[in-house]
Amino acid sequence: MEKEESTNKNNENIQSENEINKIDNKSNTENPTIKCIFKKPNKQRNIRKRSDDLILNTSNNADEEDEDGNEEKDKKKLKSKINQYTTKQDKKNEFSYDSSGNAGSSINSAELSSTQYMNEEEEFKKEVVLSSSRNNNNNNNNNNNNNNDNISNSEGSGGSDNNDDGIYRGMKSYSTFVEKKSDLTYKGGGVKAGPMKTSTTFKLSNRIDHQPDVCKDYKQTGQCTFGDACKFLHDRSDYKSGWQIDKEYEEEQKQKRLNNINGIKNNNNDNKNNDDDKEQQQFPFACFICKKQYVDPVQTKCKHFFCEDCALTHNRKNKKCALCGEPTLGTFITPPKKILDQLMEISKSHFKNQS
């Protein structure tokens, strides 16, 4: 029976295939109909394509906005409620009476527990921050003290034991030969009280030579265009500044040493007396122009003496010295008091003897 049913099915399939082939042959023999297929238009064909960078940026911005929104929501949730009452109606709404007549708050126990938890969490965070800052300060102070102790130990031992190992222990482990005082400047954690300690490696000594400001014009010529309004000192006395005195003293000491080495005796006093006698002999007893006794004697640059009136009248005619012919440039100096007195004594004694 089963074989017969299978043969019948095969025959039916064969017949159906033959019919389909006949229909296809007829369609091929007949006039073929043209079928047009249109592609569906794209809805977004007029929209310009966006670059990949813009898409990434927009997606990142959207993610950031979502994160900011979530953070703001979290902050709003974390804000604790402040139990502050301003009116009686709010108090009535907040509080209710139980069946037993006892007053109780209408706030849920869950809300109270959440607010208490948030307050406790904030206080805990503050305590953690304060404790961490204190620990950091204490650690810094301990490190500084330990370093100073190590340095002092190395100094006490001479630094020979530590440095001969060949192990590098940092810059602070070098042996220092300068003693450090136990001041706050060294052991205070960033706190420096009082003045800083001066360096012990070198010392500096200053010497300041204070000398008055002398008017140069008045000292050389005896005249100043500013007059009494001049801020400099009007002084014509000869004096040496500090550096000149020191220089002369050093030269004298050098000369003494050389003389002692060569076996020459020091005869400075005798030489000075001889020089003074020669100078007194060199002073002229009368003015070269008027051939008379000096009246207000004046000295030129070439160290020749004339009367003041005689020198000025001669300068109007000739700008050179009357004796040697060197240019005076119109400058006449009044000699120092010591030389003036000697000059006047010589001239007076000469003219007295003649009379």
Swiss-Prot record:
PROSITE patterns: ZF_C3H1, ZF_RING_1, ZF_RING_2. The keyword Lyase does not apply. Keywords: Metal-binding, Zinc, Zinc-finger. Disulfide bonds: none annotated. It comes from Dictyostelium discoideum (Social amoeba). GO terms for molecular function: zinc ion binding. Residues 62-71 have a biased composition (Acidic residues). Residues 37-48 have a biased composition (Basic residues). GO terms for cellular component: nucleus; U2-type spliceosomal complex. One of its GO terms (biological process) is snoRNA splicing. A zinc finger (RING-type) spans 287-325. This is RING finger protein 113 homolog. The keyword Zinc applies. InterPro entries: CWC24-like, Znf_CCCH, Znf_CCCH_sf, Znf_RING, Znf_RING/FYVE/PHD, Znf_RING_CS.
